[in-house]
Structure formats: C-alpha cells, structure tokens
C-alpha cells in the first residue's frame, strides 16, 4: 500500500480527480490552527463539514485526517480536554461519512483511531550506523513500533492504547537534496543523485525488513516552501532518474508480492 496525503490548503484539487483515474489513494487533510481554544474548535468542526460536503464523491480519498502531529492540540498527550476534541473529531467525521477511515492524530499521541499512523525520520546519515540500526529495530515488529519511540511523544496519548489497528509508517525518509539552489532542509542530506538513490534504498531496506507494518508513505513527493526533501523540485522537476526510484521500489515490492 502506497498513497499520498493531500496537505496544506483545502481546495478542490486536480489531485483528487487524477487519483481516481490512476487508482492513486489519497488522504484528506487540512491546515491546522496555531493554538487550541474554543474558537479553533468551532472553526475546525465547521471546516471539516465543508470539506466532506465538497470532496465526499471523490473515490480516490480513502481516509480523513483531522489532526496531524498534534498541531493545534499541543497538549493532547496528557490534556483530557484536547483528547476529548480529538475523539469528538473522530466520531464527528464518522457520523458525516461512514465509508472512510479516520485517523485521530497522525504521527503520535493518538486517541481513538482506525489506523495506527506513525512518523519516524530517525534513520540518520549513512555514517551513523548505530542510529540506523535503532531505526531499523523500531520498525521491526508490531511491539517495537508501539513501544520503541523515535520522538519525545508516545504513539498513543495517556489513557489510550493500541487496539490491533493496522500500523502504517505515514511519514519517513525526508532526505534533503538541493538541486535548484532553494534554501531549505531535510532530516538527512545528500550531495548528489548517486548518494540520494543509495540513501533511499537504505531507508526502504529498513522499512521492508519490518514484519509489523501494513503500509507506508514516503516523505515526500515534492519540495515545499521550506523543505528540500522531495523526489521532485518545487516546480515538479525530477531530482533523480525516476526509473531508478521505480527500480528500487520494485526490488522490494515485487518480491514481497511474489
């Protein structure tokens, strides 16, 4: 399973139409509020009502993600009020749309959720072998994915626990590679195409060594304003030979299917 979250501004996008025509799976997200208060709660509930009314008929959308990485709910790990809001959004979206999955807080500190969605960028530079070994170990089994943390935050918020949901690595990679002089950053960095492809294969090797993961989403398809970790530049030009990327993907994926 591979898919692409639709992030940033919510607008009717050709991505949804394209996804439907090429059988590409898309997750519906929206921009997060800067802070948590009653106004942000009301605004987000209203915006999600509009989002689902607008995008419900797109078959490419398979999951709704109202919260990502605790943005807008910074105390969700321990604050019961913010946890209530996360749970309310989970049930609210299910009430509006019974056909799709809902993730309560993509990345970590989840409450009620249909997918256990984990973010892990802790693979390190190629020379950081101990860091890479730990990264690989955190992914190796279902138990490790839940208990061996790669961030300061727990996978589930206080009072909540893993309930046998499918576990997906919904953000990883983030290999920074600048080919256009755009300022920005990545979680790790390389200097040329050869290094990028080697690092891409190194990271995917750890992912496919896991016996606990059900799927993944690589970060990310394109560079954005402040990040240079895309497979494509900001103006959608390939940074590396895309046939080489496909060959690496097929090297793992086809063997698993067969």
Where are these regions (language model features)?
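Substrate-binding clefts and catalytic carboxylate motifs of secreted carbohydrate-active enzymes
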Residues: 60-64, 84, 91, 112, ...
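Active-site mouth of glycoside hydrolases
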Residues: 1-127, 160-164, 195-196
């Amino acid at each position: 399973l591979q898919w692409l979250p639709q992030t940033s501004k919510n607008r009717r996008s050709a991505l949804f139409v394209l996804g439907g025509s090429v059988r590409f799976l898309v997750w519906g997200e929206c921009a997060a509020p800067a802070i948590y208060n009653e106004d942000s709660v009301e605004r987000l509930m209203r915006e999600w009502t509009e989002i689902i009314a607008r995008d419900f008929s797109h078959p490419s959308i398979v999951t709704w993600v109202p919260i990502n990485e605790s943005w807008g709910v910074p105390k969700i790990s321990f604050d019961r009020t913010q946890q209530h809001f996360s749970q309310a959004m989970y049930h609210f979206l299910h009430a509006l749309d019974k056909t799709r999955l809902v993730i309560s807080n993509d990345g970590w500190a989840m409450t009620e959720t249909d997918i256990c969605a984990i973010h892990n960028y802790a693979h390190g530079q190629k020379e950081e072998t101990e860091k890479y070994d730990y990264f690989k170990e955190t992914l190796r089994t279902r138990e490790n994915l839940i208990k061996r943390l790669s961030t300061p935050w727990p996978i589930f918020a206080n009072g909540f626990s893993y309930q046998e949901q499918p576990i997906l690595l919904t953000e990883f990679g983030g290999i920074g590679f600048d080919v256009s002089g755009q300022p920005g950053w990545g979680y790790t960095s390389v200097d040329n195409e050869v290094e990028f492809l080697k690092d891409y294969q190194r990271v995917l090797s750890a992912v496919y060594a896991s016996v606990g993961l059900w799927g993944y989403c690589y970060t990310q398809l394109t560079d954005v304003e402040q990040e240079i970790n895309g497979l494509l530049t900001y103006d959608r030009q390939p940074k590396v030979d895309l046939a080489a990327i496909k060959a690496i993907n097929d090297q793992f994926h086809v063997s698993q299917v067969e």
